[in-house]
Each structure stands twice: as structure tokens, then as C-alpha cells.
């Protein structure tokens, strides 16, 4: 059937306008070569005439040497090649390149040069027969392809990825091309030498086409175009026809123009949208959708913005959904990443009953790209506007596509289980898990219900069946267990972290903690990529928040200290970039850092995180400071340097006003608790409004009040234990409004941990303190003074050694030569045989003031 890809006025030829242009260019080249030959002849004749006209001294000055030069010039013959000979030379050069590539098995070069060879032969055959050297080359290439296939099947020689790609492309093209020269190839294979030596070449008839000017090509009568397809007259008079037969040719042109400059991608998108309207077969629609979605994604690389436009993203999502619908309705068409490309644009592949047609492409890559573009768009939108909420609603469409893509690749993997297909299933399951692990159960339930309602009723998933979509915990557990079983490396580690995060978010502290410990991720997390390390930090923080909600203050503070103690919460959680004044970060590193930032709806509230960390530190630090006030040996123990620094800064203030923010509220509460006023401490801590952001805020405030009562009791006992001989438990119960049973339990724990030197008298219901175990205030001050004196002595001796440059005879206190009472230069003495200085000065260094060792040196000299 004649192609309507191009239409030229005044010509009924079935060839495309591109072939006509090549024909015209060939004729123009011949004309130019003829003109060059004629101009060269004219130049030669003019030179001869000028030489004949030479008269006078010039003519008679020529000697024998000049005659010999003329003979040499006559021997030099200028060879002028015709256009046909030049093309044959180019053909031979191309064949040499193919032969060299065959020796090193470079199929990429063979494929490229084979296409070039065919273009050169097409020009030669327009004015003559097919060259025999071309027949020899294509026949030998086909034999070489068959040998390579046999070696691959036997396992003798395996090709790498790039070689296999070039080999598959070359094999299809050679097979298709050799069909047109089957008779000549058979003659060559029967007797190769006779075929190459014979001169009886059948000249192919050449039809002399009349010269067609550009004016005639521009005229394209619209009445001559059939109405079975669209027709558009483009620039230069080229008629673009959109018919089912020309779809593959259009797609070929679009694919070859990818990555080139000055390519109008919007025009290509409009072209493919028209091709969709005329597409008739599932194969045509699938090919158009695959190219159309890729072209929409290419728009991002040329735009000034770093993210995809909203309208183009929605169009790409609709095209992706339509592509999945076509694939679900036509199970004999499969989009696979390792499939071979169909090279014949003139006809479409035919599918026999029971066979499957594999089309090159990747469904999972499209789903991942849609996910990445949505995330990138959310990163660039102000989260405090309605636009962000509206854009976030598109996540439901994306999640539906992810579930649909998962069901599709599951079916392919079950039909034929291979490593690439298993990897595709793992990738799409991981993407789905990353969209649900940080959400509360209620939100996931709503999302799952809406997703399964939007999908066709006959569609189901074997990993997460439609019937079990109501149980959120089983959903996350099924996704994670599947990845634990079939994946490894980064995907497996990320699945583990997502499950731990989900359990911690839903107040299952002990399960999440045990999973984190058993995974051993804390030991080797530095070996993973940056995004996985960010997920690890988020999971660690969520475990700490879960421990705090459960009332486990020590576990919460210990877990959060690694992230919150550094002061770089924003960076570690990928929730912002801290721009330092003298940073050496390159623009490329900054760009990558911004790409890793999480969208706002995935953020953990940093103010709430800081409040919980400071509150946990307060409950541990205030009793510790009271305990170390009477125990100098415990002075250096610090649990939270951040909290201590803030508390010291607040105490240095001359005037302290009311608490203005969350941090001030926690510090004021700590000061009340240290002073023994636990009621004011509880009132101040509960007045912080950020607790309302947590689930069940009343329960949290009740837990905080109870914790303040217990830590207030411990602080009181640490502070006033040296002043009591015994203390009634009933008195403590009235003072801190705790039950006597609770107070007895707290005191018993303190005694067992050796924090309190006392005994519990259950008969009298009192605490009996042991004297002489702990130091008194006076004894503590004496020990402190002794420590400072020893530090001063060590500092002076170190300074003295530096000033005397390590001389061994400076202030020696041991017995030996030169020591006090020995022979030599002791105090007031002089070494025997040593040099004498005037005035009796022994060894005084000239210049400067002699170091005397300060107060300690004076004491030694005395």
C-alpha cells in the first residue's frame, strides 16, 4: 500500500519526499562534479595559452634543467574521479570498518556502519547495478550472525549488555535487508570466486526522472488527499498524513530526534495525540503510548523549572492509565524491558494464536517517574497554600497507578519468573510501601478503599488481595514480608525501616525496638546511600517519640540524643538546609541536597521533637544534678549537653521574664523542679500548647504530671538526705501526692541501684538513712580544694618544663648528682669543673626575665 507520510505535487511516486531529496542531491552532486571538471579544463587551457605567449628574456632563459622539470610534470597525471567512483570508494571504506568491527566483535559499530552501507548502496543503485562487493559483505555478515547465535546457545561466548543490544539490532536489520537480495546472495554462496570474477552484471534499469523544481514540490493540492486520515501541509510543502500505515514511521522519526537540539517536543506530542486517534490495533496504541509518555517526561529537561508542569503530569498519568488498560485487555501484548525492537516500519508484527508479542518498554519505570515528578513538584510548592493541598490530592491517582502496575507485573512474573521481572515487582512494591508507611491507619484505610473502587473489578493482587484491604497492619506486613523474601540490599533495608517506622507510629514500641536491634542496621547504616540514611534517622526519631508516648523517658532520651543532640535535626531528617556562612558546599552538592528534601506532608514536627527531647532530658538531668551536688566524683557525668547549656544560659540571665516559647517553658519547669516546687513545674510544663499536636493530649499531660511527681521525690531525697536520720513515708506521700506503695517502690529502686544510702523500715513505715557513707558539705569542699590544688601543681610543673626546655637539672627533688646534699651544684653550690660566671650567677640565660615558678616555685626555692 502506498505510504502517505509525505505528499509532493506533480509526482505519483510511492517513495517518500526524503528519498526524492536524496535523488535530487545526487543529481546536483553529479552536475557540480561535471562543472568542476570543465572549470579545471578551462584553467589548464588558459595556463597553456599564457605560457605560449611568454616572450623576451623569459623565453630564452630556459635551460636544460627546465626541460627536465617539464618532463617530470608530464609524468604527474592528475586523476579526476567521477561521483560514481567516489561512492564506490566510500563503500569500500565502510566495508573495511565493518570487517574490523567483526574482528573485535563490536556489534554497535557493525550496526551503525551497516545502516551507512545501505544508504550508500541506495545511491549507487540509482545509476547502476548493485555492487558485488556489497553482496559479498551482507552475505558474510549473515553468516557471522549465525555463528554468533550458535556460540551463544552453546555457551562458548557470551555478550555483554551493550554488545547484546547492538547484536539484536544488527541481526534484525541484516535479516530484513537480505530478503531483497536473496537471489544474488544464493549465487554468491554457490560459487564465491566465480561470482566475484564474472562481468555479466545485469544492469538495473534507471528511469530518468524529470527535473522537479522546488516550486513544483510546494504545490500540494488538498483535493488529492484521501479522507481516511488527517493531512497537514507543513513547512516546505511537505504533506503530513496520519494514517494507520504511517504510525510506525512517524514514531521512528520522533524517537530518532530525541536528545537533539531545536526539537519541538510539544509539536511531537500533538502529532502522537493525532496518531492515537487513527490507531487501530493494540500494538499501534501501545507503541504510541510508550513514546508519548516518554516525550512528556522529556519536557522537564528543556524547561527552566526543575519539575514537571501539572497539566503535563496529569496528561502523562492519564496516558499511563490508558496504556495499562490496553495491556490488561490484550494479554498477548506484553511490555518487557528486555524485548527486541521491531525494525520493519512498513508492516506490523502478526501474532499467531497462543503466542505473545513482546514490546520493549518499562511499566515500572513510568510509575517511578510519575512518583518522582509528583514529589519534585511538592518540593517546589509553598506548603502553607491551598495549591499544595490541591497538588497533594493527585497522590490518590498515583497510588492507584502503582497498585495497578503492581498487579500487572505480578501477572507477568507468575507467568514466567525471571530476575528482571522479579526486580520490577520489588521496585513497584517498594514504591507502594513508601506511600503508606508514614500515614496513620485511618488515612491508609481511606486511600485503599478509594483505590480498589477505581480499579476494574476483575483486577486483583496476589501479594495484597482486594479482600484484605481493610486491615492496614496486614497490608504493611504483607508488603514488607514479600520484600524480605524476594529482595536484598537497599530495598530490603528500606522495607525493614518502613515497617519499624509504621510500628513505632502506631505505639508498638517493643516490637519496633526489637526489629531495629535484630536488623543490625545501626552497625552498617553508613554503608548505604544518603536517602536510606535519612529514612534511618526518621525511623530512629519515631521510635523515640513512641517511647515518650509510652512513658519510657530514659529510652526516649537515649534514642533521640543521637539526632537531637547534634543540633542538625533539619539536615539529618531532610526537612531543610542550613546555609552556613563559610560553607564549602558546591552548587552541585547543594542541588543534590535540595532534591533529597522530603515534601512537607512527610515532615516530623521539629518543635515537638525538641520539646520532647528537652523534657526527657529534664527528667533525667535535674535528679542527677541534685545527686552530684553532694558527690564530687560524679561531677563530670552529663546526660544531655544541650539541656545543660540551655539551663546554664538561663541561670546567667539577670532578669528572666515569662516563658515565650516551648524551650523557655521546659527550662522554667526544670528550675521549679530543681527548687522542689513540683506543682509549679507540672503547671508550667502542661501549659505548653504543643502537647495538643500529639494524639490523646490529655493522656500525655497526665503522664507528664506523674513523671514530675516521681522525679521531684527523687530530687528531694538526693538533696536533703544528708540532713535526715529517718523520714516517714507518709510525710513524703502527703508532700508529693503519691501513694505510699508508689513511694516505697521508688525508694526501693533507688536503694537497689545504690543511688541512696538508706534502708526501708517497713515496721515503722519510714526510711532510715546511713551516716558516714556520703560526704558532708565540708568534706565535699575539702575534696574539691584538694583536686584543684593537684591540678594547679601539675599545670605549674608542665609550664616549668616547657620554660627550661626539659633540662634534667631544673628543680630536681630526687637524690643524685647535683641534688640537695650531694656533690656538685646543689642549692648555693656549683658543679665541679663547670664554667664560672661573673657575679656568682650560675647558668643565667641572657635576655628576658628569669622564670621563678610563681608561688609554687617560691615555695620550692625556700
Swiss-Prot record:
It comes from the Eukaryota. GO terms for molecular function: RNA binding; translation initiation factor activity; translation initiation factor binding. GO terms for biological process: formation of cytoplasmic translation initiation complex. It is found in: Cytoplasm. Residues 55-65 have a biased composition (Basic and acidic residues). Residues 17-54, 66-75 have a biased composition (Acidic residues). InterPro entries: EIF3C, EIF3C_N_dom, PCI_dom, WH-like_DNA-bd_sf, WH_DNA-bd_sf. The keyword Iron does not apply. GO terms for cellular component: cytoplasmic stress granule; eukaryotic 43S preinitiation complex; eukaryotic 48S preinitiation complex; eukaryotic translation initiation factor 3 complex, eIF3e; eukaryotic translation initiation factor 3 complex, eIF3m; multi-eIF complex. Residues 818-862 have a biased composition (Gly residues). PANTHER family: EUKARYOTIC TRANSLATION INITATION FACTOR 3, SUBUNIT 8 EIF3S8 -RELATED, EUKARYOTIC TRANSLATION INITIATION FACTOR 3 SUBUNIT C-RELATED. HAMAP family: eIF3c. Belongs to the eIF-3 subunit C family. Component of the eukaryotic translation initiation factor 3 (eIF-3) complex, which is involved in protein synthesis of a specialized repertoire of mRNAs and, together with other initiation factors, stimulates binding of mRNA and methionyl-tRNAi to the 40S ribosome. The eIF-3 complex specifically targets and initiates translation of a subset of mRNAs involved in cell proliferation. This is Eukaryotic translation initiation factor 3 subunit C. It comes from Neosartorya fischeri (strain ATCC 1020 / DSM 3700 / CBS 544.65 / FGSC A1164 / JCM 1740 / NRRL 181 / WB 181).
